[in-house]
Amino acid sequence: MNFLNFSMLVFAYLLGSINSAIIVCYIFRLPSPRSVGSGNPGTTNVLRIGGNVPAIITLAFDILKGLVPVVLAKVLTGNEFITACTALYAILGHIFPIFFGFKGGKGVATLIGTLFGFSWILGLIFVVTWLCVAVITRYSSLSALVATVIASFSVIFTSDLQVATPFLIIAIIILVKHKGNIQRLISGQESKIGDKAKAKNDSN
């Protein structure tokens, strides 16, 4: 691996480590997303805590954290596998941020950015899948999980297995991070889109 490729991976991880949910809640003087609602510092929890504006800002920045390094890797390296690995490192930064004690979000919004950066078709597959499941079920977590699996596996059909492997690893990590959501979906206790945040120990 040359210096450029290594630099792209480091840049992706460090950018991914900037947790916008925590920063946005601090700027808007909202409770920390790590102590309210689901306890997850991500877009959905910010939406429950502070409403549309903070959530949109959080979502936009988290998407950019995935989009920017992947586009740069694509342009600068011209290597699909390195670009896919850059996507993986951006996700790892978001989920295990060095700046926040390695305790971050669940990676879905950043995944959207990496998918659009890698191929707009993959990004579109994710968004359409998410919207369809969300409209039918009103479960943000279920929508994210289904969209993550479908979009990540779709890389196999747009590239080869080696290039798809980092995205398949991303899908596995995101599924594991949503273990609690999956358990609550099964038990019927998962919050739906539009539900207000509660104290962490009373919430999903």
Swiss-Prot record:
Entry protein name: Glycerol-3-phosphate acyltransferase
Family per similarity comment: Belongs to the PlsY family.
Keyword vocabulary terms for this entry: Cell inner membrane, Cell membrane, Lipid biosynthesis, Lipid metabolism, Membrane, Phospholipid biosynthesis, Phospholipid metabolism, Transferase, Transmembrane, Transmembrane helix
HAMAP family linked to this entry: PlsY
Top-level EC class as recorded in UniProt: transferase
Pathway per the UniProt entry: Lipid metabolism; phospholipid metabolism
EC number(s) from the headed UniProt entry: 2.3.1.275
Reactions catalysed according to its record: an acyl phosphate + sn-glycerol 3-phosphate = a 1-acyl-sn-glycero-3-phosphate + phosphate
Record InterPro entries: G3P_acylTferase_PlsY (IPR003811)
Known partners and oligomeric status: Probably interacts with PlsX.
Molecular function per GO: acyl-phosphate glycerol-3-phosphate acyltransferase activity
GO biological process, one term: phospholipid biosynthetic process
GO CC terms of this entry: plasma membrane
Compartments (UniProt record): Cell inner membrane
Organism phylogeny: Bacteria, Pseudomonadati, Pseudomonadota, Gammaproteobacteria, Thiotrichales
Function in brief: Catalyzes the transfer of an acyl group from acyl-phosphate (acyl-PO(4)) to glycerol-3-phosphate (G3P) to form lysophosphatidic acid (LPA). This enzyme utilizes acyl-phosphate as fatty acyl donor, but not acyl-CoA or acyl-ACP.
Membrane topology: Multi-pass membrane protein
TM spans (from-to): 8-28, 53-73, 81-101, 116-136, 155-175
